[in-house]
From Swiss-Prot:
PROSITE patterns assigned to the protein according to its UniProt record, in alphabetical order: MRP
Protein species of origin: Xenopus laevis
Gene3D superfamilies reported in the protein's UniProt record: P-loop containing nucleotide triphosphate hydrolases (3.40.50.300)
Listed name of the protein: Cytosolic Fe-S cluster assembly factor nubp1-B
Pfam families assigned: ParA (PF10609)
Originating gene: nubp1-B
Location in or out of the cell: Cytoplasm
Length: 315
């Protein structure tokens, strides 16, 4: 991401962006004509630095959602836990939801802090093979609000990707904010040179969520971000007593399955509602070890295996 002029509007795409001087945010900016002429455009040196840092990371997976509250961060946390159950795999979880960092609590790491070493920022470890980094570790209190404009968020993401000392990692999972914002553009721009395996998009069955997922899919295609597949979360409730399934959020337009068929995207699986998932997130424990035989756990295992198979085929 290139520099942002001091007198730039709030949603300035950056002087080195392909949208510089052309996006709707540039209207009325005193720098518009200069940026549009490409006179300020220059490669961001951080891109090469990040590429070198990421050369130690085999697979990079972005977790996206069109709408907040569909369980994206919950999925990211459990994807990390599930991959890390293989003790031979090194797993890293990066939280770039700058204004709503929930990963520290979900991973049982609230109150932890980041330490500086000679080789960069040291991530916080949940297990010997599971490392986490989040802006939540930089706040004095979990209740502190992060009130930053786009350029400052982009700078934080750049620092995470360039300066965190992950070491050699098999899987880097990047938990992003909902929607398509500056954070998504920054991550894609910085990681493209290093190679992103793809994105997993999380949704719920109802149309109000699916309509935003369609936009997310279009975003991925426009920025040439491969789509690993879609996960339908909160997909029915299986009674633990009678094992009958009820549709708490009815898929009025066919749910994620029909959407994936229409848009030629893979459906990785459906995760049923389970109150214990929310409980495990609140207590910072792994759902896989707490309720290993629940229908939700079994669904997660199938989805995680499909993600691994996709990544291995891309090697």
């Amino acid at each position: 991401m290139a520099d942002i002029p001091e007198n730039a509007p709030q949603h300035c795409p950056g002087t080195g962006s392909t949208e510089a001087g052309k996006s709707s945010a540039c209207q009325g900016c005193p720098n518009q004509s200069i940026c549009a002429s490409a006179a300020t455009s220059a490669p961001d040196p951080a891109i090469e630095e990040i590429k070198e840092k990421m050369s130690l990371v085999k697979h990079k997976i972005l977790v996206l959602s069109g709408k907040g509250g569909v369980g994206k961060s919950t999925f990211s946390a459990h994807l990390a836990h599930g991959l890390a159950q293989d003790e031979g795999k090194e797993v890293a979880l990066l939280d770039v939801d700058i204004c709503g960092p929930s990963i520290p609590r979900m991973m049982g790491l609230e109150g932890e802090q980041v330490h500086q070493s000679g080789s960069g920022w040291s991530p916080v470890y949940v297990e010997d093979n599971l490392a986490v980094m989040s802006v939540g570790f930089l706040l004095s209190s979990p209740d502190d609000a992060v009130i930053w404009r786009g350029p400052k968020k982009n700078g934080m993401i750049k620092q995470f990707l360039r300066d965190v000392d992950w070491g050699e990692v098999d899987y880097l999972i990047v938990d992003t904010p909902p929607g398509t914002s500056d954070e998504h553009l920054s991550v894609v721009q910085y990681l493209s040179a290093a190679g992103i395996d793809g994105a997993v998009i999380v949704t719920t069955p109802q149309e109000v969520s699916l309509q935003d997922v369609r936009k997310e899919i279009n975003f991925c295609r426009k920025v040439k971000l491969p789509i690993i597949g879609v996960v339908e979360n909160m997909s029915g409730f299986i009674c633990p007593k009678c094992e009958n399934e009820s549709q708490i959020f009815p898929p009025t337009t066919g749910g994620a399955e029909k959407m994936c068929t229409d848009l030629n995207v893979s459906l990785l699986g459906k995760v049923p509602l389970d109150p214990n998932i929310g409980k495990s997130c609140d207590t910072g424990k792994s759902f896989f070890t707490e309720i290993p035989d629940s229908p939700a756990t079994l669904s997660y295992r199938i989805i995680i295996q499909r993600i691994q198979d996709y990544c291995e085929k891309k090697k």
